[in-house]
Design a protein with these regions (language model features):
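Structural cue for short, hydrophobic secondary-structure segments
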Residues: 31-34, 58
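Serine-hydrolase catalytic-loop signature spanning alpha/beta hydrolases and amidase-signature enzymes
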Residues: 36-41, 56
Length: 179
């Protein structure tokens, strides 16, 4: 996790490789890193899942990578939203004329979250924030976290039914109510 140390990852993925063609659509896996982190941190897992027939996408979360790390407050608010944005974006690529047109089974999406990525995942699976955290010292201003609280109607109405599975790795979860 030291951004000053260079690492070389040797894997099986190929840049600009054509997607595999199959008779059925492939499930989607979204990989969400910790705070700070980057899209490469779980690349061996992503490659392994892709080799087993999953469409895998890994996120660089804005304001939360080694290169652009900001205060963690923005991460609390944005992490669950980032994950849903990526799922929506993959749906667009899956639509007619998109790069992955008709290849993704969008109704069978899984999210792998490491640390703060697990935090977003748990929130997206129904683990709403505790009301006490909305106005706590570490929360973003203007009560932005209120829309992630389990008792908020926006939160309950916004849960994404496409997410059928989750794998939270050492999830940051002190702020959840429904665990």
């Amino acid at each position: 996790r030291n951004p000053q140390i260079t690492a070389t990852l040797i894997g099986q993925a190929l840049r600009e490789a054509a997607p595999a063609q199959g008779e059925e659509n492939f499930p989607l896996i979204v990989i969400s890193h910790g705070y700070p982190g980057n899209r490469y941190l779980l690349s061996p897992l992503g490659e392994n899942l892709a080799s087993k027939g999953y469409v895998v996408v890994s996120i660089d979360h804005k304001d939360s990578t080694y290169e652009d790390q900001q205060h963690i407050k923005s991460t609390f608010y944005n992490r669950p939203l980032d994950q849903r944005f990526i799922i929506d974006s993959m749906g667009e690529l899956n639509s007619t004329g998109g790069f992955l047109s008709g290849m993704i089974d969008m109704d069978n999406t899984g999210v792998v979250g490491y640390s703060m990525g697990g935090f977003g995942l748990v929130n997206n699976l129904g683990g709403g924030f505790n009301e006490a955290v909305v106005n706590s010292f570490g929360a973003p201003p203007q009560g932005l976290l209120a829309q992630h609280v389990s008792t908020d109607s926006r939160y309950r109405g916004g849960l994404d039914g496409r997410i059928k599975a989750g794998f939270a790795i050492v999830s940051f979860s002190q702020t959840f109510r429904n665990l």
